[in-house]
Design a protein with these regions (language model features):
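HIT superfamily nucleotide-processing domains
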Residues: 2-149
Length: 149
């Protein structure tokens, strides 16, 4: 029994590292420190969302468009963005955000995930895990979500 103690220690260490995520913690702390620079750089350059061709759009309203996320985290993973660029949800008028939510609900019904359940996510600033400074909402569904996704 004693000869297997290293396996136990390795499993415990892997669990602790996975839970604490020190690399992610350091990354987001650095990102938070650089927030003004990140925002300035983001405003100075077009975001990847601004080059999505119209043929890839899966939904549209007067002020918002939707398209499939290329890095899917669920069977249904759609991004909804305002046509006019806002860095974060804090910068956008409430009526634009409401229109984005309305488009997300319409798409959830079209994708038949309205009854089984879906998630709407808006990441804001570094601690909110925002990496692209163009307001965008994730519509996620088609699988059982965990409480911490």
């Amino acid at each position: 029994m004693l000869k297997y103690w290293r396996i136990g220690v390795a499993v415990l260490a892997a669990f602790v590292i996975g839970q604490l995520n020190p690399i992610g913690f350091v990354y987001w702390k650095l990102a938070e420190w650089r927030l003004p620079q990140i925002r300035a750089e983001s405003l100075a350059h077009p975001t990847p969302f601004e080059s999505i061709p119209r043929a890839k759009w899966v939904g549209e309203t007067a002020n918002a468009i939707a398209f499939n996320d290329i890095n899917r985290n669920a069977p249904v993973h759609i991004l909804i963005i305002p046509k006019k660029r806002y860095n974060t949800v804090l910068d956008a008028p409430p009526e634009i955000v409401a229109e984005m939510v309305g488009l997300a609900v319409k798409l959830a019904r079209e994708k038949h995930i309205d009854q089984s359940g879906f998630r709407l996510v808006i990441n804001t600033n570094p601690q909110g895990a925002q990496t692209v400074y163009h307001l965008h909402m994730h519509l996620l569904g088609g699988r059982q979500m965990r409480s911490y996704d």
